[in-house]
Curated annotation (Swiss-Prot):
It comes from the Bacteria. Catalyzes the reversible conversion of 2-phosphoglycerate (2-PG) into phosphoenolpyruvate (PEP). It is essential for the degradation of carbohydrates via glycolysis. It comes from Rhizobium leguminosarum bv. trifolii (strain WSM2304). Keywords: Cytoplasm, Glycolysis, Lyase, Magnesium, Metal-binding, Secreted. This is Enolase. It holds the Pfam family Enolase_C. PANTHER family: ENOLASE (PTHR11902:SF1). It is an enzyme of class 4 (lyase). It is found in: Cytoplasm; Secreted; Cell surface.
Amino acid sequence: MTAITDIIAREILDSRGNPTVEVDVYLEDGSMGRAAVPSGASTGAHEAVELRDGGKRYLGKGVQKAVDAANTEIFDAIGGIDAENQIQIDNIMIELDGTPNKSRLGANAILGVSLAVAKAAAQASGLPLYRYVGGASACLLPVPMMNIINGGAHADNPIDFQEFMILPVGADTIAEAVRMGSEVFHTLRKELAAQGHNTNVGDEGGFAPGLKSAPEALDFIMKSIEKAGYKPGDDMCLGLDCASTEFFKDGKYVLEGEGRTLESGAMAEYLAELAAKYPIISIEDGMAEDDWDGWKTLTDLTGKKTQLVGDDLFVTNSARLRDGIRMGVANSILVKVNQIGSLTETLDAVNTAHKAAYTAVMSHRSGETEDSTIADLAVATNCGQIKTGSLSRSDRLAKYNQLIRIEEGLGPQAQYAGRSIIRG
C-alpha cells in the first residue's frame, strides 16, 4: 500500500528569488510527501553538486535539468518500491547518478525525492516526520542558534565574519527560547537604529549594519541582551560562524573589515581570545575548509571549552568527518541535508558524529523555502541544536513555528536541550 506510484517535481523559487527543486511523491494508498530543496551562498568545495541549467533562463540558475531527472530517470528507477525502504531508495538514486558528488542527476534532484519519500511514508504511517524518522526516543527540542547580525557572504557590509548568533540556553522550552530570541532581536534593532545604523536584514533575517569588526558586532549584541533583561553567559550565550574559507587567500586570513591579515596560528589565537572575552560557546568554520593544521591548532587551543563546528570542513560527509575525528580536529559537525544530498547519508553523518562524542547541529541554508523539514530532523536525530536564521523572514520562522508545534505535540515528553549543550 506504500509503493511509490508517482513523482511530480517542479521548479519553484527560494527566499533569494532563485529557482530550486520541489518534489511531490505519491504512494499507492494516496499518501503524498512534499519537499523543497534549499541552496547555499557560501558553499564548501567538497559539497554535493547542485545541478543548474546554465544559459540565459533565470540567469543560468534554472533547475529544469534536475526537475526532469526526478520526473523521469529517478522515477523509472524507484517507482513501485515501498516508500518505507528509505535506505534502498537512496542507494538506488546514488548508484543511478554514478558520480562521487551527485553531479549527473544533481544533489537537488536526489535530495528532493529522498525527503519527499520520507514525508510520504510518514503520512502513510500516521506519524509526524520527527517520530517516523527518529522513533520513540525523539523528544529533544534543540537550542536555536539565532543569527541576528549578518556579515560576509550573507550581507553587503564590511564585517568579515558571516554570522553572529544568540543561543537562549537559559530557556525551559523551545517556545520560551523563541520568545527570548525575539525580544533580543527587536532590542538590537532599536540599539542599531539609535546609533545611526541601518536595520535592513540579510539573507537569513539578521541585521546587516555597517560595522567593521567582530568585537563591535559582539558588543552590540551583548548590550542588547542586557537591555532585553537577560544575562549574557547565563540566559543567553553567543555563537560565531566565521565562514573563514571565504577570506582565506594565499594561505592567510584576510580580514578586510578589520584591516589586517593573519597567519593560520594567529587566526586561531584571535578566535580563542574572542571566546575567552565573550560568552561564545560555539565557533563554526573558524578556519578554512582545507586548513587542517589551523583547525588542529584551534582545537588544541579552545576545543575543551568551545564547540568547534565544521561546516565547509565536513560538508555533512561521513568520510571527511571520520578524517577529522582521527586527526582530533573540531568537535562538532554542521548538518545540511543538501551538502550531502540524501536523507540516509544525512542520518549517517549525525550517527558518526554522536558515536565519536562530536555534537551535531542541524542547519538551514541561506536560500530557503517555507519547507520546515529540518525542524523535524533536528528532533528526530536528538541533535540538541539548530541553525535556522533570525527572528524575521517567514522562510526562517517556518522552522521555529514547526518546533513550537512539535513541542506541543510531545507534551510532557518534550525536553529542551538548554544548558546541556555547553562544553566544559
